[in-house]
Amino acid sequence: MNYQQQLANSAAIRAEIQRFESVHPNIYSIYELLERLDEPVLQNQIREHVIAIEDAFVNSQEWTLSRSVPELKVGIVGNLASGKSALVHRYLTGTYVQEESPEGGRFKKEIVVDGQSYLLLIRDEGGPPEAQFAMWVDAVIFVFSLEDEISFQTVYHYYSRLANYRNTSEIPMVLVGTQDAISGSNPRVIDDSRARKLSNDLKRCTYYETCATYGLNVERVFQDVAQKIVATRKKQQLSIGPCKSLPNSPSHTSVCSTQVSAVHISQTSNGGGSLSDYSSSVPSTPSTSQKELRIDVPPAASTPTPVRKQSKRRSNLFTSRKGSDPDKDKKGLESRADSIGSGRAIPIKQGMLLKRSGKSLNKEWKKKYVTLSDNGVLTYHPSLHDYMQNVHGKEIDLLRTTVKVPGKRPPRATSSCAPVASPKTNGLTKEVSGLQISPNTGNVTSSTSVTQMASGPSGISLGSFSRMDGMHQRSYSVSSADQWSEGAVITNSAISSDTGLGDSVCSSPSISSTTSPKLDPPPSPHANRKKHRRKKSTSNFKVDGLSSTAEEQEENFEFIIVSLTSQSWHFEATSYEERDAWVQAIESQILASLQSCESSKNKSRLTSQNEALALQSIRNLPGNSHCVDCDAQSPDWASLNLGALMCIECSGIHRNLGTHLSRVRSLDLDDWPPELIKVMSAIGNELANSVWEGSSQGHVKPCSESPREEKERWIRAKYEQRLFLSPLPCRDLPLGQQLLRATAEEDLRAVILLLAHGSREEVNETCGEGDRRTSLHLACRKGNVVLVQLLIWYGVDVMARDFHGNTALAYAKQAVTSEVRELLLQYGCPDEQFVLMATPNLSRKNNRNNNSNAGGSGLMPTLI
């Protein structure tokens, strides 16, 4: 690292410390100002908000997030007309917001890449990229609007600004063109070729066109940029060579052949313990050691200032502010029992238990307040007060754990899980969770069965059942075959951890911990293992699995939670009844967590299978085997509002038309919600062309081999100019009234034809002044999600109310159709409903008169 970079890092550290230290003095000033308020209620309300802000600041990710949780830092740049704020809002919430945020924003979201969860940090920059932004990001998304030339040119400017601060070859980039603002009055001005050229100029980055109004490619953009970051980190990690990973402790002083500065090591608490999370910060040539860099940073800047020392913390993490709420200080914990867990899920079981410390040199037992929630999480706090304040707590996710009781056999497997071996063989049977133990090699391999190992009457052995843990091995052996006369079966609770918290495999007293893979166990396996624990006997089991002597039963109220990652937690109750109640409750939560996990997998698998079958049924519709515009075989792109399939070349032309004419989506690459599948399944190419090519006589339709220009002329004439559109079925009746009738009769082809001919005003025509229902109300009353979706795409007003003030959502609730209700809520339809009752006779007469103009009584409302 050169001297200038070292100075820059030192300045950045000083600035961060100054920023961090400035927060609390300002908060304390707010507390002082609160004392001047005369209204106690307002004073307490503001104080609670300030305390919440202070707690959120103190518990930010840099102090609380596990170092095993990696981060992905994504920056998004573009001008105010680019649509970047709508893109981010759609990704985070699934909804569309048209307003652009001039100041940008900071957001967090979990994202999964290659099966691993990452904390995605999204930085929506309000202006051009600066030096601090450039050095922070792992990847950059450049956003412009396809209808705004200035936003397009701004990308070039922002890219050059970024290149001034950082080498762009080390930053993954994605270019996004947004379609949100494209409309009939605001056409597209950036064609596909110019956008592709821009992506090539930006070091050939990936280019996407998105639409935040209905989510086109939004998820793909962020998923792709996350995958690019992970791939870049892996490449950089491999290129570093022998420096595989950083030490787990930030205070570790050893360095690899390529040294890493202390600045970056101090940041590893946010990004996990792997060098791949921040390998871009490793300098190419070693220049300054960690100790030298630490010396350069003045010690005064890394310690609290005198102002901070004089000011004591006033939040609920520590003591309450004097005078802020004297009643709370006078109340004891017993008087506040009703407030336990306020604002959180009510535990299904809670109480005081003893917990053994996990520290290697200090394994005493301490009282903990333990709670078990119905979400499969067990939490323990040092005291009831800490639990009530929700501080200093630790959680155990029970999904990948098991619970053991020392001195008690694990549950015996039945024949359906593992057949019992003969008493003479003492063999280990098959089907043990896919783990295969080799008696010769000492390796643990993945298989579907465990080989039998017979050891005769003298005992059975697991051979060298070893696993690597840091730099040592641990092997287990089993003896005393007379205790296993009915066959040994390894269950989930049979594998002890190597932290000294589990007594044995299968809780047998004859399992020893050795440092060499001997088959013969030492004569006294427990001679040196439990010096730190109170004396407990673990021999001579009874049939029910409990000890047979009164001495063994004395004070034996312990249970152990063991995880798949070899972590263990020792707890002890005050009685057998309390211990068994805890064990039963924990086992039930483990079972519930496993069942919910399996249910989620089955649901996901079933959803995926159902979607694949639905898409295949779409391909099998009449005419869908060929492109709707050029007859190319096997089209795999779709236009949602047209309900037709097309080839990839025609889909590019459709994208240029704008979303107001054609909403393009990939059958294979995009998600398909149920309402979209129903629209595509209801229409198809044959029905679509019967409408859009109903008057194409005398015109030659292009074929799959036709040049792109010819296809584009045909498509624009067909959809943009509507030259081949079938004529209206009735010239005497207004188009809006025809649409109302067709919707009431659920005539899909007529609705498509009328929507293609109609304007926004005609689509929103009502049944009459005494009714004021639109076609959307009628479609919702029928529960027809296909018609509802088509009407919304063609501009029907989802906020429209009938004569009695009811929105379309009220009619959807009457029809008991959840799909229609969810669709309306997605597009912002108000969830308001007036009392629905039978229509008075006078209103019925008026409605008959109004509906007679529509051509029939099918439009007469029966509810208000």
Curated annotation (Swiss-Prot):
Subcellular location: Cytoplasm
GO cellular component entries: cytoplasm
Keywords: ANK repeat, Cytoplasm, GTP-binding, GTPase activation, Metal-binding, Nucleotide-binding, Protein transport, Repeat, Transport, Zinc, Zinc-finger
GO molecular function: GTP binding; GTPase activator activity; GTPase activity; zinc ion binding
Domain of life per record: Eukaryota
Annotated segments matching region Disordered: 266-343, 405-455, 499-549, 845-864
Zinc finger (C4-type): 627-650
Feature: compositional bias, Basic and acidic residues: 322-337
ANK repeats: 771-800, 804-833
Listed GO biological process terms: protein transport
CDD domains: ArfGap_AGAP, Centaurin_gamma, PH_AGAP
Main location: cytoplasm
Subunit-level organization: Homodimer. Interacts with several subunits of the AP-3 protein complex.
Biological role stated in the UniProt entry: GTPase-activating protein. Directly and specifically regulates the adapter protein 3 (AP-3)-dependent trafficking of proteins in the endosomal-lysosomal system.
Domain description: The PH domain mediates AP-3 binding.
Annotated protein name in UniProt: Arf-GAP with GTPase, ANK repeat and PH domain-containing protein 1
Protein species of origin: Xenopus laevis (African clawed frog)
